[in-house]
Every structure is written in structure tokens, then in C-alpha cells.
Amino acid sequence: MGYVGVCHKVYVCGMIRVVKHAALDSGRWKGLALLLFLAAAICLASLLSGGSGISARQAVAALLGAGDEAARNVMMEVRLPRLLAAFGVGGLLALAGVLLQALFRNPLADPYVLGVSGGAAVGALLAMITGAAAMGVQSAAILGALGAVAVVYLLARGGGTSRLLLTGVVIASACGALVSVLLAVADSGRLRGMVFWLAGDLGWALNPWSSLLAAVLAACLALLVARPLNVLAAGELRARSVGLQIEVWRTALFIACATLTAIAVINAGTVGFVGLITPHAIRLAFRTSDHRLVAPASVVLGGTILATADLLARTVANPRQLPVGAIMALVGAPIFIALLRRRAA
């Protein structure tokens, strides 16, 4: 093959690669548009559905500040705050899952499975029982989550999937035992509310706007550090070869995961499997592990998933309300088992 033939072959291969990348990028944009449409549809369904007997026309009027006072109270004091809390908490848990999976280099890492949510719950409950202020409860939850993720990392480091999951089970069990002890000594007047909160309840969100704002800010920060996350997820050898300060980044990820999980637990209790399901779904749908896409898309999908679970929790057993954590466990447990079997195969 002459020089002209070689140049022609290189040109053809290059054009094929450009076309493939263009088609892939086009598919990803379409996927993002579909994801945003799905999120908008769930928002609309969540705002218009419930057991209060409010029609769609009344709901829209109430959101616009018109209509009767009862409808406005239901929309502005119940449905809208729950929707905001669902998207905020779901986004936080999904992003925590993304960061944990990058930290442990394991697709089965999740705040709930590894006991990080349990650690945050222990810290928050302990602060509540001792009469701490809101800032004290938040700080205790972050410390509890940070302690749990640090213990899991130290015990499961380099041990593979089985060791990671076993360590998570042990930490989660220990946190569950501590929660039981704290509930046993808690004031009986607050016991029912604490139990329902622990099962996952968006109705207890103290400030739904704060969780949503935290999720948006966290997604923006994740975009800024997406490239180091990609390098860290590729392994220590790759990270050291490009001069990445591994221990600094690990410490930062510890703190970030603990903070995200703690904010979610404070607002909604222990809700599981959002951080496990969401990153997997995004990677499969977009056929990429690039955190520049996975992190922000996971925040949107995580919020959508939890908003859907909350919609089911409010409407399936109407007029009774189910814990949103129970809905997520019923959906997430079979998916977790399927992923575990797939990884073992």
C-alpha cells in the first residue's frame, strides 16, 4: 500500500470515528432530554395527585396564588415541600452513591448498604435525644456518617466486593442496634415520629429548599471535579501516574459522602438503594462512566426516582401514607440482588 493509500485509510478511519462520536453525543443529548421530560412529568403528577380531593384546575390555581385557602395550604404546605424534599434528598443520595462507587471502585457501594445512612441516623438521634439544636443535630449526623464511611473504608480496603459488602452489613447492623437502644430510652411522646422518620418520611423535612439547593450545588461541584474522579476510579496506578494526590482526594470524598448522606438523612430518614440504582441506570442508559455526565444526570434521576416513590407512598394506600423508605426497599432489594448475581457471574 502506497503513501496515498495509507492516507486514505487513515482519513476513512478518522471520519468513521467522528461519525460514531457524533452519533453517540446525539444519543446522549436525546437521553438527557428524555430524562428531563420524565422528571417534569413526575413533578406534575406529584403536584396533581393526592387524597385531598383537589382537582387539577384547583391545584394549578393554588400554585399560582389563587383559589381557595384550603387548596393553597395543601399545595404550598404539603405537596410542593414534599416534592422539593424528594428531589433534593434523592439527588443527594444518588450523588453520594456516585462518589462512594468512585472511592471504593465498586459499583455496589451505596450509603444505605454500607451503613453510612445508619451512622448518620445514629448521630442525629443521639443529638435529638440530648436536646441539641438543629445545628447540633446536623453536625452529629455528619460526624456519624463520616465515622461509618471511614470504618468501612479501613476494614474493606483492598478486599474486593465480598469483604466490602460484609463490612457494610456489620456496620449497618451495629448502627441498627444503636438506633434500637436510643429509641428505647427516647421520650415516649416523640417515639412514634422518630420511628416513622427512620423508616423514611419526607413529611418531616425541616427545610425542603435546603436539601434541593444542596443537591444542585453538589452537582455543580461534582462537575468541577469530574476529571479527578475519572482518574481516581481508574485505579491508584493511573492516579499516581498523572500526579493526583490520592489521600487528599480520598479525604475530600469521605467528607463529601458523609455530608451529602447526613443532609439526606436529616430531611427524610434512612432511605435506601437510591445511591445504588441511579448510577447504574445512568451508566447503562448513556453507555459511559464519565463523571462529567454520570454525576449531574444521577442527581436528576435520583430526585425523579424518590419523587416517584413518594407519589406511590402517598397514593397506594390512600388515605394512609406509607414510608417512602419501605417503597424504595421493595424496589431496590431485588435490583441489588440482581446486580450482585450479575457481578458474581
PLM segments and residue spans:
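Alpha-helical transmembrane segments in inner-membrane proteins
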Residues: 3-345
